[in-house]
Swiss-Prot record:
Enzyme class: transferase
Molecular functions per Gene Ontology: 4 iron, 4 sulfur cluster binding; metal ion binding; rRNA (adenine(2503)-C2-)-methyltransferase activity; rRNA binding; tRNA (adenine(37)-C2)-methyltransferase activity; tRNA binding
Cofactor(s) for this UniProt protein: [4Fe-4S] cluster
HAMAP family: RNA_methyltr_RlmN (MF_01849)
Native source organism of the sequence: Bordetella avium (strain 197N)
Protein name listed in UniProt: Dual-specificity RNA methyltransferase RlmN
Length: 382
């Protein structure tokens, strides 16, 4: 007799869970109760769900599970940043990072085991690509981190918090391993769970999707679930961006900027964040700043300058701090809202661009990288 694989409830958004409970003879309010137990109270035992009928709990125990990915390693940085390495099977692992600050707690989650975009300055891209994560594996990172952090630091924080500061995790950014918009069908239900009042109850302004510029899926996200958007820009012209972000060859800057403008009509914020990794001698000259100013004036945006975090075999160097300061000042003098990201967790390789996990590459990206990364990047101006 064949056994039916239990359904992992972490992978179901409100509609999917309501439909499932309905198939089992339950009412919609039962699905809402169940969703609150799973995502708000971080419960993984159906026996603990005391306001559910006993026979329904028994049914759940037979047919469903609440199961996050196994954690292989947890690391803590001297600055309070925490990183988890989750086992996704078959020799692959992904990384998730929690960044505590005085006014917020940000969780950076992954959407793929590896990444096919292969940005030149990103450690994840250097590892290659294995597979997309399932919704349960994406939301499971949030579920696990919330559960662990509330147990570890939640009580102390909540005791001293005001009414508006009761969350350990107040912001979620999809800036970990992978390109979220190339795993859209699994990412979308995860986003909806983050926003759902019976799920994690985050506002659209506090959930950010970062993309390297998958234009058609940016348009879909604007219609389906318009959260805050960050775009990995990293170059002010097509010639240089073709080298740094190969996806630019498919969706060049003109198309990308037009998609950003369309997204703004639906976005929860009145600007797009452009991320710009500062690379010594590559994209950090005064001429690059001049070109970037011209680009930034075409769409309402904020520039986030990111110090490059080196990794083996990158062949790249971080821009010196004085150069970053001058570059940022030129942008601000031109009226462009500009911030310089503070590096967090670099002592545990948890900073921007350092997440690598463990990836069994199915795309031969690592082989191609061995050849291509020996070729110097041209310092290109428009």
């Amino acid at each position: 007799m064949d056994t039916v694989e239990p359904i992992n409830l972490l992978g179901l958004d409100a509609k999917a869970l309501t439909d499932l409970v309905g198939q089992w003879g339950g009412k919609p309010f039962r699905a809402r109760q169940l969703q609150r137990w799973v995502h708000q109270r971080s419960v993984d035992s159906f026996d603990a769900m005391t306001d559910l009928a006993r026979d329904f709990r028994a049914q759940l125990s037979e047919r469903a599970i609440i199961e996050a990915l196994p954690v292989n390693i947890e690391q803590r940085s001297s600055d309070g940043t925490r990183k988890w390495l989750f086992d996704v099977g078959q020799g692959n692992a992904i990384e998730t990072v929690f960044i505590p600050e005085d006014d917020r707690g940000t969780l950076c989650i992954s959407s793929q085991a590896g990444c096919v975009v292969n940005c030149r300055f990103c450690s994840t891209g250097h590892q290659g690509f294995n597979r997309n994560l399932r919704t349960s594996e994406i939301i499971g990172q949030l579920w696990w981190a919330k559960r662990v952090l509330e147990a570890d630091i939640g009580s102390a924080r909540l005791a001293n918090a005001g009414a508006e500061d009761t969350r350990v995790i107040s912001n979620v950014v999809m800036m970990g391993m992978g390109e979220p918009l190339l795993n859209y069908d699994q990412v979308l239900p995860a986003l909806r769970l983050m926003l759902d009042d019976n799920g994690y109850g985050l506002s659209r302004r506090r959930v950010t999707v970062s993309t390297s510029g998958v234009v058609p899926m940016m348009d879909r996200l604007a219609q389906d679930c318009p959260v805050a958007l960050a775009v990995s820009l990293h170059a002010p012209n097509d010639a240089l961006r073709d080298d740094l972000v190969p996806l630019n060859k498919k969706y060049p800057l003109k198309e990308l900027l037009a998609a950003c403008e369309r997204y703004l009509a639906h976005a929860p914020r009145d600007f797009i964040t452009f991320e710009y990794c500062m690379l010594d001698g590559i994209n950090d000259t005064d001429q690059h700043a001049k070109e970037l100013i011209q680009l930034a004036r075409q769409v309402r945006c904020k520039l986030n300058l990111i110090p490059f975090n080196p990794f083996p075999a990158s062949g790249l160097k971080r821009s010196a701090a004085p150069r970053v300061k001058v570059f940022a000042q030129r942008l601000m003098d031109a009226g462009i809202i500009t911030t310089v990201r503070k590096t967090r967790g670099d002592d545990i390789d948890a900073a921007c661009g350092q997440l690598a996990g463990e990836v069994k590459d199915r795309t031969r990206i690592t082989e191609r990288n061995a050849a291509s990364r020996s070729i110097p990047i041209r310092q290109v101006h428009a």
